């Protein structure tokens, strides 16, 4: 008897969940397709001592991303000849407009060595959480030697009044806000990459020094293209 009641209760729960799901699908108000983007598709020409020049999208990105995807990119250099590559990728109409940067990197010759989340202190606003990737790829120097170039990359996603360093959180927020808040995020991701120059140039920077350099650059550049967090 207890077993029969338990089975009946489970069946009722399944039916209730199914009914609620169908009701949400049937009666949820369609989200506003014109929801604003969380970024402006522009990068500054100057960030402190850093001077930037426009750079085109990579061939891997052109192949993987739909033609309506917005991309802006600049390569920056400071007086000591350190360099930073900054990029904003803004989704178009198709869901595949955005993906994890980890998908494109192997096509550009990079190997991902580690991944974690770091905080970027910002003036007058909460710290930004970004995913950090430590990368390597073989490069040939002018003297003919082949060495392993190391690099530090920071990236994060920006939606309508929200940011996250995690791809799965972006996916969850997309579904949740679409159903509950009738909000259709037009997501973008921002990434900032710099080579780790220790051993490659005079006064080269190690991994932690490169991270600090990127933190300072982001703190100066972010207010020009992003309002949150």
Predicted regions and their residues:
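Short acidic/polar alpha-helix capping motifs at helix-coil junctions
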Residues: 2, 12-13, 36-39
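Short extracytoplasmic
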Residues: 43-74
